[in-house]
């Protein structure tokens, strides 16, 4: 049985990136690659490995919110892919028999594309117009100092102590960055890893709430460390957040050093959980949960 308290009390783990490669590949090819990604590690950190495995094996169906987020992402970073991914619904009343038939015909003709309403497209385009100036700030017109939708993969080694014994395990990893840019800052150049987010609003409560609940800190740290392993230069992580509600404003959020360090501790914690799960023979949920001391 794996005791969560043992994980909490484990010595500070050490992560070494043994191999790190950069890839210019399509999203489908990235998804097919083997490796732990930030979404999986977040689930391990918050819920445990069995939940992360269940999420991996049973991907969540696309909700309207997910489609909207993906649409916004495409318009900002891959606008040339819009027509191959989305079909704009005509004005159809699906409450009527005729409307249901027309919708079914349109869906079949779309050939698997995501169906979006014209009103949602208009909102996403306003969001795009707001986000693009910030997302591409400092990027040359020919974009030679930036790469969109860039992937990295490799092998990392996690070292830690468990019940007084030294443990070591090599694990595959992968990340996909919205943008990696080399920008001028002060007397030198800095790598900026930029990620776009769509939020209900840019109120402090919405931004901080989303950052905490979705562990932006872990993504920031994991991505910075992976990119540094490939190219050891000063870097920072920037979120460009855009609100879904009018007037659809955008803002840059630069992750602090404290947030980065917190994220490093989080992803290392998740790696220890995963490593011990593997060493224990991939136990079932019931065997894995164990007992923890709660001091909430």
Task: List each language-model region with its residue ranges.
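Hydrophobic/aromatic-lined pockets within catalytic cores
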Residues: 76-81, 198-201, 228, 275, ...
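Surface-exposed cleft-lining segments at the edges of enzyme active sites
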Residues: 159, 165-166, 203-212
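Metal-dependent nuclease catalytic regions and adjoining charged, substrate-binding loops involved
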Residues: 2-7, 210-217, 222-296
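Metal-dependent nuclease catalytic cores that hydrolyze phosphodiester bonds in DNA/RNA
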Residues: 1-174, 289-292
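Conserved catalytic cores of phosphodiester-cleaving nucleases, focusing on short active-site segments
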Residues: 175-209, 223
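A residue-level signal for conserved active-site and pocket-lining positions in enzyme catalytic cores
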Residues: 72-73, 179, 267
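Short, solvent-exposed loop/turn segments that connect beta-strands within catalytic domains
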Residues: 161-170, 185-190, 231-233
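Glycine- and acidic
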Residues: 57, 204-209, 251-252
